[in-house]
Amino acid sequence: MGDLLYRRSPNAYYKSSTALKKLVAKLYLEIGEANFGEDYDIVLGGGFLQTRSPYDLDAGQVTYSDLMMLFPFDNDLMLCSVSGYNLKRKFIETTNSNYYVAYSTYGASIKDNIDDNATYYILVDSYTAQYKPNKLTVIKQYTSGIYARDLLADYIKRGGME
């Protein structure tokens, strides 16, 4: 659990809680596009994302334990459908400061012209998917047991924090 993932280079930098949540939303989107994008036009990835204490990631060595402290919950990733009306209200125009999203190229091109009655596809975690007020329908689950912290660990191993 405490295995060193990556010793950051001298120019690596601190990541704030906000930056981490934006990055996780982007990683959700990448997973969605890579695994479901051939069959679905995915608008965005993200949802309700919140880090836990210590909230931020300091420059220096990063272990899996560090990431587990930041993102401790075992929320699987889900491809969901949502009406245009709820997509706008709950994700695009939300006033909830805990919702973070990353738009696909397709999503960025249509986000200002969403049809309330159309169906759209998004990639979120199981917490966001199962939160009833979001009114999402789960279409498919990504590999069980892959969580936000795992996506961050893979990103770091690939040199994404340099």
Where are these regions (language model features)?
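A conserved active-site cap/scaffold subdomain adjacent to cofactor or substrate pockets
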Residues: 1, 5-23
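Feature captures C-terminal
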Residues: 18, 22-162
